[in-house]
C-alpha cells in the first residue's frame, strides 16, 4: 500500500495509474461546519496497487491526480459518487470523465433505488465490512491503522463489484 504525502511521489504514482484501464476511487471528507466538503483523503485502487493520497499534507499538489480524473480512457468507479464528484468539481471546476457508479448499476440490476455500500458488498461479494471508522475525524493526523484499513478496503470492494457487473456473462463469452 502506498501512502502518498508529497507531490513527487504523487507524480510517480499517477504516471503508473495513467496506464490503468479501471480505477476505483473514494474520498473521506468532513462536511459538518462548512458548505462545501473539506477533502481529507483520496483512496485509489487499480486492481494491483492500493493507494492513499493525503490532500491535507502541506507538500502535495493534487494536479497530477486531477489529470487522471479527466482522462477519458480510464474508467473511474465510485459508489454513490455525487459527493466525491462534487468535491473534485469544486477543486478543479471539471467533472471527472468516464465515471461508473456502482449504486446506479445496482439500481438498474434490481437492488433498489439507493442500495447502501455495505449492503451491496454483502449481497454481491458475500463479505462483511467494518463501517465503524466511517464517521471518524478524517482531518486528524496521523490516521490510525483502523482508519487506513477502512479507507483502502472501500476501494478494493468497489473494484471487485465493478468487475462482476462489467464482465461478460458466460453466454456472452462466445461473441
Q: Which residues are covered by each model-predicted region?
A:
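Conserved small/polar residues in nucleotide/adenosyl-binding loops
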Residues: 165-170
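Conserved DEDDh/DEDDy metal-dependent 3′-5′ exonuclease domain
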Residues: 2-5, 9-11, 17-25, 30-164
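N-terminal low-complexity segments that are often proline-rich with Ser/Thr-Pro
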Residues: 173-175
Amino acid at each position: 500500500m502506498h501512502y502518498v504525502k508529497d507531490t513527487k511521489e504523487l507524480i510517480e504514482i499517477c504516471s503508473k495509474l495513467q496506464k490503468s484501464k479501471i480505477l476505483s476511487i473514494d474520498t473521506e471528507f468532513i462536511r459538518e461546519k462548512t458548505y462545501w466538503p473539506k477533502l481529507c483523503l483520496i483512496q485509489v485502487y487499480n486492481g494491483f496497487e492500493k493507494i492513499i493520497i493525503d490532500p491535507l499534507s502541506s507538500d502535495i499538489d493534487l494536479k497530477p491526480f486531477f489529470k487522471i480524473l479527466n482522462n477519458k480512457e480510464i474508467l473511474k468507479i465510485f459508489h454513490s459518487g455525487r459527493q466525491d464528484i462534487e468535491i473534485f468539481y469544486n477543486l478543479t471546476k471539471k467533472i471527472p470523465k468516464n465515471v461508473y457508479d456502482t449504486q446506479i448499476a445496482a439500481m438498474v440490476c434490481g437492488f433498489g433505488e439507493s442500495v447502501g455500500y455495505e449492503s451491496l458488498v454483502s449481497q454481491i461479494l458475500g463479505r462483511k465490512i467494518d463501517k465503524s471508522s466511517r464517521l471518524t475525524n478524517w482531518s486528524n493526523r496521523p490516521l490510525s491503522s483502523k482508519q487506513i484499513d477502512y479507507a483502502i478496503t472501500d476501494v478494493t470492494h468497489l473494484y471487485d463489484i465493478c468487475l462482476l457487473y462489467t464482465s461478460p456473462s458466460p453466454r456472452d463469452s462466445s461473441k
